[in-house]
Amino acid sequence: MNALSRLLFLLPAFLTASPYVIDTISFPEDVPVEVGALDFAENGDLYVALRRGDIFVATPQEAPDQFAWRHFASGFHNACGIHIVAPGHLIIGQMAELTEVKDTDKDGIADSYQALSTEFGLSGNYHETMDICSDGNGGLYLAPGTASHNGPTFTTPRGNFADAGRFGRNYASVTWRGWVLHWHPETGITPFSSGYRMHNGIERDPQTGHVWCGDNQGDWRSSSPVYHVREDSFSGHPSSLVWDPRFAGIENPLLLPRRLLDDLWNKPAFRLPRSMMNSCAEPAFLPESFGPFAGQMLIPDQSGDRIVRLMPEMVDGAYQGAATMLIEGEPLHRGNNRLAFDHHGTLYVGQTGRGWGKLSEGLQRVRPTGDFGFEVITCQLSSSGFQLTFTEPLVKATNLRLTRYRYNYGYSYGGDELETKVVTPESVEIDSDQPTILHLTLPEGDLLSDHIYRFDLSGVSSDSKSYRGKLTYTLNRLLRPKAEHQITLTASGDDRYRVEINGDLFTEVRTKGFSNPILYPIHGPSGLAMTRDWPVREDGRPNEQQDHPHHKSLFLGHQGINGTNFWHENREESGIIEHARTIETRSGEDRALLRTFNLWKDSEGTVICTDTRELTFGLTDQGARYIDLELNLHASHGPVTLEEWKDGFLAIRTHPHLRLKPAKGKGV
């Protein structure tokens, strides 16, 4: 090859700067580098926990082959989580326990191992990993994974064993598997969120304090989801519900009514297709060193050679958003399992094989060069389509197409893209004032909730580059229309929700203190009360008849379900309807919404059935206030018989001035 041809061969690489420099960090030759966890101490030292049981520490060096690794601790059972309290003081999440590890004599080797918690079960199944992350307040969040049908459980598990938890491909036969737990040194373990299959990675956003975890495609997972972990939420995999006391006594969680699971399901903020993700691992949040992407989320692929960049945005009270690639392909290895940033903003990637697919293990370092290429910075939902912001001004945007599809939610392992439709934008406009911004308007009716949009942006280019990246948007909710009136719903203590219209009280949903949840008071547009005060207020109001004590403003009930009376109170056969969970609230603009889960219990406290209900509060165009109720009654705990009685379901006891009095012999 002559000098000219060599120059021409090198020219494209010279002109196109790489956004990242990737190094492979050397380890001692006799150490299998299967990284379960890694993090940096405040002094800059890097601690790496290996799944084979050892922890190593080194001070990072400029040259990747000059890290002087020191053996710090050993004897761990598949250590997959690490929290560094201080140099030489760690908390490790291993399969069997949460363990505090200290170097008390300051010789560089751990000499104190203390079990902080063994409150979660251990079945002996190989699949039960556990990552951890800080809660920012002295505690930790734990992510104990479920077991796999590909491996057995031992005959002597630790903790309680539930036969009902042994069903399905991935199962939760021992305590708290498939949950996110909260641990604090003063309170121990508290269940936080259920419904996870294999949440191999959990992290807290340092800006918002919100907790995130990914999960893996599999049973009850059509694709690889990423969840915003909300307290007392259910993320869709039912096996873990056997450890929820509200479902005590169920024989098989997989046979719970599908409508109940649908109603409880906290939908993932991101649903990543197989073309982008095979197995979600530990999330991380980008520091300032990553320029325009700072604050966004990364999630690595434990079964692929890629790291995905996520762009969360809050829409109508819940997260959703776009996903694209940060890095894909060589020199990045496969098996990307754990992420950590040093104090300079350099990304370290810990890799491990899991026993299937092409194995890869090791430790790599990713350093941004400052030239981030031609990429999408953000992709945000608009009222008529999407708004994209790029790293460089645009000169062309033609032939754009989107592919819309959805996934099923159900027992099947994985799932296909369903109801696929190519959507051609009605208009594509480069912003005249800010040419890095691209506005896409879709035809009316083509912007749908509960769908995923895949973008073909090959017709978009800057002055010197064409866009070649992958981009999808998980659209769970549409933007609410702007409204003249603000309708808000806020918690008031732990026993009620207050609904206001432009700051004036509409009603309160009272979830405790009575034999069933009620709405009281209910005010009309002029502020007048629409329902009776007694017996909610013991003194009632003047001239109010104090009869039918079960008539509490607006309530739900039924006189006979499986022999239990959920209408009248203080009778031998009377039961109660107990508010068990707030599924979600939405507030602002043109309506407020409350979704709850409730237990119908007999006189001995046994759950007969359950309900999910959705209350929507709003204003008509004419200014009238309305309450919309959707009630789903579920045979979740066994067969349900609705007996034939005159009293059942919705009832309202109005203000005395609104009452119609019957004429003798004629009725009302």
Give names to the regions the model predicted.
Residues 1-10:
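Sec-dependent signal peptide recognition
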Residues 547-623:
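Extended, loop-rich substrate-binding clefts of extracytoplasmic carbohydrate-active enzymes
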Residues 9-19:
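Bacterial Sec-dependent signal peptides at the C-terminal "C-region" and cleavage site
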Residues 482-548:
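Beta-strand-rich N-terminal accessory domains
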Residues 17-373, 377-389, 396, 428-432, ...:
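Beta-propeller domains with acidic blade repeats across secreted/periplasmic ectodomains
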Residues 371-481:
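Acidic, low-complexity Ser/Thr/Gly/Pro-rich repeat segments typical of extracellular/periplasmic
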